[in-house]
Amino acid sequence: MDVGSKEVLIENPPDYSAAPQGRFGLPCFPSSLKRLLIIVVVIVLVVVVIVGALLMGLHMSQKHTEMVLEMSLGGPEAQQRLALQERAGTTATFSIGSTGIVVYDYQRLLIAYKPAPGTCCYIMKMAPENIPSLEALTRKFQNFQVKPAVSTSKLGQEEGHNAGSASPGDLDFLGTTVSTLCGEVPLYYI
């Protein structure tokens, strides 16, 4: 190298600092590609925020629905608890506050109602295409209790048996759940 060029370099050393790269400092990308990348990142962030808001709204709606269902099933005027039988899921038992217990037996198409004092048990057949609601059944059974003049027959007498001599084996046609509910009290078929 020439001595003169060394002096020039010593007096004015070359600038080894990095070239200005803009605001975000994305190296090795042309400016059009940088803009496109920024736009894509912004769009992805907006989509993530929108999806998050929708999922949060769905979660809140589900919690609200569960809370309304829980409040309607556990209300103070008619406390209703549903317990499905584990085996085949063929019976549903409802405790209606302090008024009594209703059992739907879907396999045998029977509905049993035992009032709270537990003095008797009412049994009726149900049609599979027209299953009465719990509210309609409660009204029907309560109206039935108010009117003692309605002629009813004991289940054993209607079947041609003597009701007083009915053994526990004679109640097998009612099923386990209904037999457990109504086994110790007189049965009336409606």
Swiss-Prot record:
Biological process terms in GO annotation: respiratory gaseous exchange by respiratory system
Name the record gives this protein: Surfactant protein C
Annotated localization: Secreted, Extracellular space, Surface film
Keyword set includes Zinc-finger: no
Disulfide topology: 121-182
Alphabetic keyword roster: Disulfide bond, Gaseous exchange, Lipoprotein, Palmitate, Secreted, Surface film
Propeptide residue interval(s): 1-23, 59-190
GO cellular component: alveolar lamellar body; extracellular space
Organism of this sequence: Neovison vison
